[in-house]
Amino acid sequence: QPVVILLGWAGCQDRYLAKYSAIYSQKGCTVIRYTAPWRMIFFSETCGIRSLQTPAKRLLELLFDYSIENRPVLFHVFSNGGVMLYRYILEMLHSHKPFKDLKVAGTIFDSAPGRRNLKGAVRAFATVLMSMNVLLKYFLLFAFATTAAVLRILLYPLTRFIHKSHYDFLLQAPSRWPELYLYSQADAIIKASEVKYMADARQQLGVSVKAVDFAYSPHVSHMRAYPTYYSSLCMTFLSDCL
C-alpha cells in the first residue's frame, strides 16, 4: 500500500489535516502528517535560513524507521507553507544517498505554489496570528512585511544566488513524477495565474500534469467546498500514479 505524506499549510491544526488523512487511510494507505512551525515559514525562510531542512530530512527518515521505504510515496502539499518544506524534501531526494532509492509516485499541490506575492503572504500570516494580542500581531506583521519586501523582492536579484525562492526552485525541479494542481480563481492568498503558470512550465519539461480550477472555493478550502469531488480527484490521481 502507498505511503502518503501530508505537508500542512502555515498555522494548520492537525485536526484539519486529519480530515485529509481520512481520504487515504480509508483506502488502506499509511499516512504521515506534518505542519512546519509558522516561525520557520514566515521568518527563517524569508531570511534565507534553511531551518526547514531538518524536519524535511526527519520526514524522509521516518520511512526507514518504520520499514516502509520500499512502498510508493505520494506527497500532498498545502499552500506555500507546505511547498517550502517540500522544496527541501525534493533536494534531498536527489542529493542524499539513502533517499535516492525512494519510489515517489506523484505530488498533489493544494492552493500552491505561489510566487513573491507580499499581499497574499501578509494575509496568510494575519490568519495565523488571529488569536494573538493585537499589538504583538501588528508588530510581527510589520516585521515580516518589511523583511520580505527587502530580502525576497527588492534584493531578490542578488539573494537568489544564495537562496533561490521555492517557486523558482520548483519551476526547474529535477523530479519528473506526475503532478496534480488543485487551485481556485477565488483564492485571495495564492494567485490562480501563478499556479497555472507553474503547471504549464512543468508540463513543458515533460512532467505529466493535471490542473483543476475549483473557481469559487477559498484558499485551502477546496475539500470543504467540494468534499466528494476533491476526494475523487485525489484517489484517481493516486491510482493513476501506481
Please give the residue ranges for each predicted region.
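Short, surface-exposed "cap/lid" segments of acyl-processing enzymes
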Residues: Q1-I41, Q185
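Active-site nucleophile loop of the alpha/beta-hydrolase fold
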Residues: V104-N117
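Serine-hydrolase catalytic core
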Residues: L141-M235, D240
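Short, surface-exposed alpha-helical segments at coil->helix boundaries
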Residues: A18, Q53, A192-K196
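Short glycine-enriched nucleophile-adjacent loop
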Residues: L85-S95, T107
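Active-site loop/turn elements of alpha/beta-hydrolase fold enzymes
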Residues: A36-W38, A112, F214-Y216
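Catalytic nucleophile-loop/oxyanion-hole region of alpha/beta-hydrolase
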Residues: R39-S67
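Conserved alpha/beta-hydrolase fold motif
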Residues: V73-S79, T107, Y181
